[in-house]
């Protein structure tokens, strides 16, 4: 049977939505019989934007906005075709960005 190593990277602006998605991926993988490493928490990235409230005067009056990006990594060290099919049929919310990286194709 061909086994592969799979890395699933999740990104979202909402940490609760991200944690629910990671939990559903982990439960689906464990039901299929996979060994799961993670979720591994990455530091959140905060982008800050500072703009003037007025269009051309009053430099002291400013408004601050920020975007927080949360990231998680889930690793499946030995995934086979049944696990991949189970993960493909999983429905995730629209606010979560998913990147899947498949490594290897060794005979195990």
Curated annotation (Swiss-Prot):
Keyword Transferase: no
A Pfam cross-reference name: Ribosomal_S10
TM spans (from-to): none
GO terms assigned for molecular function: structural constituent of ribosome; tRNA binding
SUPFAM superfamilies, per database record: Ribosomal protein S10 (SSF54999)
One Gene Ontology cellular component: ribonucleoprotein complex
Keywords: Ribonucleoprotein, Ribosomal protein
Entry-linked Gene3D superfamilies: Ribosomal protein S10 domain
Listed GO biological process terms: translation
Family according to the record: Belongs to the universal ribosomal protein uS10 family.
Listed NCBIfam families: PRK00596.1, rpsJ_bact
Physiological role: Involved in the binding of tRNA to the ribosomes.
Assembly, per entry: Part of the 30S ribosomal subunit.
Protein name: Small ribosomal subunit protein uS10
Gene that this sequence comes from: rpsJ
């Amino acid at each position: 049977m061909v086994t592969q190593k799979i890395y699933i990277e999740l990104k979202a602006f909402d940490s609760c939505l991200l944690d629910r998605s990671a939990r559903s991926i982990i439960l689906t993988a464990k039901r299929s019989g996979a060994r799961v490493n993670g979720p591994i928490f990455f530091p959140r990235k905060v982008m800050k934007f500072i703009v003037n409230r007025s269009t051309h005067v009053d430099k002291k009056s400013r408004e601050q906005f920020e975007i927080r990006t949360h990231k998680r990594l889930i690793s499946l060290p030995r995934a086979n075709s049944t696990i991949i099919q189970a993960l493909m049929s999983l429905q995730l919310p629209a606010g979560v960005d998913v990147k899947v990286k498949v490594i290897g194709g060794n005979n195990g």
